[in-house]
């Protein structure tokens, strides 16, 4: 009887052992595998734990940085530019400073047959820029299309209205004052009238902006489309030679761009004088020129100190002009759908204007006149 019981026990353990062996094999216990041999499964839960360091392995995600392909500016930069009003009265043009550091300069007609400019600076450390002058009502809209901080030394009444309408960040010397620890200062190396002695600098403007908590970054790109390759207009449809460009704003102010074939840049002259930085002696020059023919009128209800009606420019709309680079010019159209929108430049065939890598002067010129291009 006992022998029969032993046989039953043995058979029982054999059966149980077989079942356990089958299960262990099925579960890969003897296969040499482990859980890390299986493909990882994505974690579908939100885990806010900082796992940037696991053991000695750094698994911090990296964001690739793309080097800028442009030299005029870092195209990946989000630095907000400054748009600074520049005094172009002929007496003051001889003491101008800093314009060669601007990525763009816009030049507009104003009263008395003169012009006034906006110089745009981005990621620069220029300490002497000027001389600075007041705003007109059309100027702030062009600063706005760059999302720039607008810098001016006063404004006429319509200009103040435009600044209020746009709610644009601006720095006005009439409010901040000028002097030590101010965003503006005066310097008079040529013994000129006081209105021709106001300067600023990026260092001063940044210090002031930080003290006022101005937004210093932007996602807005300039309205120009830059080409990574050299723009050669010589064989383009409708292109003409452009070695000398003359804009006669009035009998008392004439502007000339002369092409330097060695540098492939245009050098500026005003009233037959070389236009240069008073403090460095460097000639103001440019790689690109854009001419915009615009409608010029007057503001009936406001006059300047001399009793002259302020000029007005029709900001929104469209018109014709020229893009000029490397010794050639080609006719273009410009379109600014609203006062607050960016200007779009196209050739007459509808294709997009791409400008050369370099600075650009944009000259707004009365459409009732003609720019001479030879």
Placement of each model-derived feature along the sequence:
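A surface/extracellular/periplasmic glyco- and lipid-processing/surface-interacting theme
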Residues: 2-9, 17, 34-104, 111-374
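Alpha-helical transmembrane segments
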Residues: 14-22
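Hydrophobic single-pass membrane-insertion segments
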Residues: 21-36
